[in-house]
Amino acid sequence: MPFKSVCRLIAAAAVAIAFCAPARAFAQSVDVIRGRIVGEDSVAIAGARVQAVSLSGNVTRRALTDNNGRFTITFPNGDGDYMMTVQAIGFTMKRFQVKRTADQEILIADARLSRTMTELEAVRVTPGERTRAVRDDRQPDISGTERNVAAANVSAGDAGNIAAMAASLPGVTLVPGTAGDASGFSVLGLTPDQNATTLNGGSFGGADVPRDAGVSSSLSTSPYDVSRGGFSGAQFNIRSPSGNNFTTRTNSLNIDAPALQWTDRAAQALGQQFTNVSLGGLLSGPVKIDEAFYNFSYQLGRRSNDLQTLLNTSSTGLVTSGMSPDSAARLLNILRAKGIPLSPRSSVSNRYTDNGSVLGTLNLAPMGSRTGAAYALTFNGSANRSAPVGGSISELPGHSGERTGYNGGVQGRHSAYFESGLLSGFLSETNITLSGSHNEGNPYYDMPSGTVRVTSQLPDGTTGVRSVQFGGSTFLDNAQDNSSLGYVNTLSWFSKNNKHRIKLSTELRRDAFDQDQTTNQLGSFSFLSLADLENGRAASFSRQLSPRVRSGAQTVGAISVGDAWRKSNDLQIQFGVRVDGNAFSAGPTENADLAQRFGADNSYAPNHVYVSPRLGFSWQYGQGAQIPGFEGAIRGPRAVVRGGVGVFQNLPQSTLLGSALDNTGLASAVQQLNCVGSTVPSQDWSGWLTNPASVPATCADGSVTSPFTNVAPNVSFFSKDWEATRSVRGNLQWNGPVASGRFTANVDLTYSRNLNQPGNYDLNFAGASSFTLASEGGRPVYVPMTSIDPASGLSAPRASRLHPEYNAVNEARSDLQSESKQLSLRLSPMTFNSKLGWNLGYVYADVREQYRGFQSTTSDPRSVAWSRSAAAARHQVQYSVNYNFFDAVRVNWFGNVRAGTSYTPGVSGDVNGDGL
């Protein structure tokens, strides 16, 4: 679905929701407060007035007890901490605190009232209708692995960035984006695509929110609530704030400049200092006290830094990057002589990144509603632009381009509490989300790309080797549109004795995409030295001969049933089962020749149903040593023990079939050209600049039979037993005071067996070694000497193929595994200090993973072996300190130290002739 159509749908949906139901208070986490009010003789008190006041927003909700003395209050935007007031005619008023201490699904507010001294005549009380307000059910999970993100641990420049917020937590690794793409994060050594992000429980495809939005964000790796799924790594939860009875107006201006930054001369020479200006704000408050609220936030910013390239970098910067100034000067002279543009047509001296985002919520929870109905309308949007995308010593400015992206969404939510005779109470929560995004890149020049290896003698006597790119970009001329429409409903049943909360959750979502993933359409040349570039002796030339334009869609659904069983006031057990499924709208076009040659069905689309059972518990024991701060204040437990085990199932992305759709091996599929050595065409850079259509579509000799010419198509498809990644994971956690109550400690042990990890297997690889290299430990080479270009050493892989009619025939498999073990320790002061606050964390991680030989250059590419993962550091220490100076300035200091990250030098290119 085109993004413009999505925008029209979003606008229409927003208008429809606005007119069909008022945009009302529906908050992000439903706190269900239930209780029974009795007298001293344990007789139920009917018609007692119960009032709950949130401590954070001063929002009030009220209810009347029924004939059995029972009441229910479902609280919008609950914070888990309330002051309760109970009043009844003839009884003394009682005030007490109700607080979530161990992730309780139901907050119990039972009370026993004593009679007043004055005896009154009997009064008949007829219970009235109770009023209830409702909110989204997103309370902390029983596992204890859900950790809130502290705003103080994220720098002002990164505030609101989802990946940066997640990476501020111990045990989470930031995965920086490339070529203008958004960054991601990794947990337990797993890839970022195994994570999921939600906004108020619905799928969220954005990368950031305004920093002043005041969102509540958390990361969970092992939630035992089966209504939460769609990931095998972690789930990052964003909960948009509701307004409250306080009117708030906030503006913030963040300015960062090189004069405020410290670095060494080398970093200064490479342009690593930057200027950042960002303006943000928040408007929040009540439309009607206790009933309707609004919350709107925004952010606009620009980040810029000097564009340091070969054209303007000082000698210090060049030498630091491994290139001598004379080598850089020689390269520039060669490029000018060949008519290759060095800079964009419009001169650029700085690299800019512009961004903007908005987030707003309208809430309504009418006090007079007989069902406690609550409504909410949330909208979000963001836009960003980077120009140029790249910009470094390894790339000429003209080789880059611009990238622009924007996304938006609207979300409507409704919830209501109702009762059905003997079945006690039900809470229904519904969430409908519509979102869309667009991303596109535009290169500065439409011409072939070139890469040259520059070898320099550096002043310290060492040799520096750098690869420099020039010409046109091979990957920026593409675009992508995504759209998503999702529905989530959770129906909760509460037993009369408040021992059980059974949840039935259903989800349905349709994701669609339109992509132009055309890359290298005008070809790319590689040169092994400046002399080769000067003389036009390219080592290789490759080109994609046809565009990669595709579209598709996927429908995903889920149903789950779970129970939160309050065995006692101290022990809660949570268990359930979740079923996920996916179905792609269409599969790749069948190539019958593949079935004949390889016994493979390339038209298969991995549509599956997955089952995920989970079991967790939370046990609190003893009583805390705190002295109650006021009458009715709750005293927490001595400590809380949590744990459990479960299956966490990821779901494939809608674009999963992209490569299989493009690479069927048919004449209508993507075609390519690869030339090595003497078959590389001659270059006419200035002619290609004015006439891109003249770029050669054949190798120099015009033949297709030479071992150094390859026009055979690639093939990609999925094995019949392919399944999405999943993890079997368990944890055990202890949390409580230590050192005579001076500190609070948290100890968590996590073990995860990560199944169905992806890997490709080339069915067209013959596997016969032509010779071995004794000087490299007998490393095998899979092509004969005659298929290795003597001038460059590059190999032509045709000789390693079972069927030369095809190049790589990659079967996507999911038969690899990894194993994650993690110990997490956290320490913070027990007592509150208005001046000084701090916390300290340590994480020990041991992650091992399987890999197939196609990912390396040693042994048989088809073999599978275990290795330590490079994605996780062995040790991590994280600290945060904040100090209040004179009640005027608060300074935060956050640090993250990692050690033990494995590093293995890699080889670029195909050096063993397996074609990869």
Model regions and ranges:
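Transmembrane beta-barrel strands of outer-membrane/channel proteins
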Residues: 127, 251-257, 296-302, 377-383, ...
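Solvent-exposed loop/turn elements at secondary-structure boundaries
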Residues: 449-451, 462-465, 593-811, 916
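Periplasmic N-terminal accessory/gating domains of Gram-negative outer-membrane beta-barrel systems
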Residues: 66-68, 92-112, 121-242, 257, ...
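Gram-negative outer-membrane beta-barrel transporters
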Residues: 582, 746-905
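A short, solvent-exposed loop/turn motif at the edges and junctions
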Residues: 55-58, 81-97, 171
